[in-house]
Every structure is written in structure tokens, then in C-alpha cells.
């Protein structure tokens, strides 16, 4: 049986997202030209939560979309026809926008690389910034998050899970040993 440790409870997750929202606003000097794009699936829910925090702070809605990376992954050669493909939903152009790419856990960097490739196929953003709830280290690629909720050094055999409730609200972050 796996040994589970709660790293962040619900209120800890909320505080981390609120802090990330403030950091995003500070770095970008407000919300002008800003869009949020979550990586399916957990990143989408966190992007929506981040958008809610930005409304609470600034009183302005920031466009929020979703990107599916299935066809951009580097580990599917020869298996692509067997993978379920989600939908990229960007109800706005990213052309010239400041894109904040959102994911739940940053590990090797391969998911982020795939997401950036998918975004670049959608247009030329003025910049892409990365916000993650948890950074657990162990990069295979030179990827670094601009905004991090919590750094949690792990071994490669451990796992980090962000749990969501039925309404897709993050409830806790769990370290599985």
C-alpha cells in the first residue's frame, strides 16, 4: 500500500493559487494582453481557478483556454492511433498575447515542451510563461516555471497527485511514496 502524505490541503492550495495570481499580475503589470491556457486535464482546472483569483483581485476577466498535448508528446511514436485525443479549446487568438501556460505538476518538462509546441501551432504569442502548482524537480529538458505554488523535491519513484472534487476544484496535493 502506498504511503500518502498531504503536502497542501484545500486552504494551502487556495493560498498558493492566490500568491501565483499576485505574482502573475506583478510580472505582467496587470492583465492587459494576458491569457491563461491550461494543459489538459489538471492544468485546465487550475487555470480556471487562477482566472477566478485574477477576477477577485483585479475585477477583470482574463480569457482562459485549454490545450491538449496528446499528438505533441515525444513518447507516442507508433502508438498515436491508440491514444484518446482531447480537444484544444482556445476561444481567443494567442497572437501577440502574453500566455500563462498552467499545469498541476512540473516533473521532467516533457509535457510543457509538448504544450509549447501545440501553442506555437496556434499562433505567435508575445511570450509564454509557466505557472505550476507543484514543481517536483527531475528535469529531462531545460524547462523552468515562472510561477510555482510549492517546490516539493521527490525521488523519481515517488509521485505527486493533485486531487480535485466533483466540481473540478483542487482539494489537496498528495505525495505518494
From Swiss-Prot:
SUPFAM superfamilies: PRTase-like (SSF53271). A motif (PRPP-binding) lies at residues 99-111. InterPro entries: PRibTrfase_dom, PRTase-like, PyrR, PyrR_bifunctional. Keywords: Glycosyltransferase, Transcription, Transcription regulation, Transferase. Its EC number is 2.4.2.9. GO terms for biological process: regulation of DNA-templated transcription. NCBIfam families: PRK05205.1-1, PRK05205.1-4, PRK05205.1-5. Belongs to the purine/pyrimidine phosphoribosyltransferase family. PyrR subfamily. PANTHER family: BIFUNCTIONAL PROTEIN PYRR. HAMAP family: PyrR (MF_01219). This is Bifunctional protein PyrR. It comes from Citrifermentans bemidjiense (strain ATCC BAA-1014 / DSM 16622 / JCM 12645 / Bem).
Amino acid at each position: 500500500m502506498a504511503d500518502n502524505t498531504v503536502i497542501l490541503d484545500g486552504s494551502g492550495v487556495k493560498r498558493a493559487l492566490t500568491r501565483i495570481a499576485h505574482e502573475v499580475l506583478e510580472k505582467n503589470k496587470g492583465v492587459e494582453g494576458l491569457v491563461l491556457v491550461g494543459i489538459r486535464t489538471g492544468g485546465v482546472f487550475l487555470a480556471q481557478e487562477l482566472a477566478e483569483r485574477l477576477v477577485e483581485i483585479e475585477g477583470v476577466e482574463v480569457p482562459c483556454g485549454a490545450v491538449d498535448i496528446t499528438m505533441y508528446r515525444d513518447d507516442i511514436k507508433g502508438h498515436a492511433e491508440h491514444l484518446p485525443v482531447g480537444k484544444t479549446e482556445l476561444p481567443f487568438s494567442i497572437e501577440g498575447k502574453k500566455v500563462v501556460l498552467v499545469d498541476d505538476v512540473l516533473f521532467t518538462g516533457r509535457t510543457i515542451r509538448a504544450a509549447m509546441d501545440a501553442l506555437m501551432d496556434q499562433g505567435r504569442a508575445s511570450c509564454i510563461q509557466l505557472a505550476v502548482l507543484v514543481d517536483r524537480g527531475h528535469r529531462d529538458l531545460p524547462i523552468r516555471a515562472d510561477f510555482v505554488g510549492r517546490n516539493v523535491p521527490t525521488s523519481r519513484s515517488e509521485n505527486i497527485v493533485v486531487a480535485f472534487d466533483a466540481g473540478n476544484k483542487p482539494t489537496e496535493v498528495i505525495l505518494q511514496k
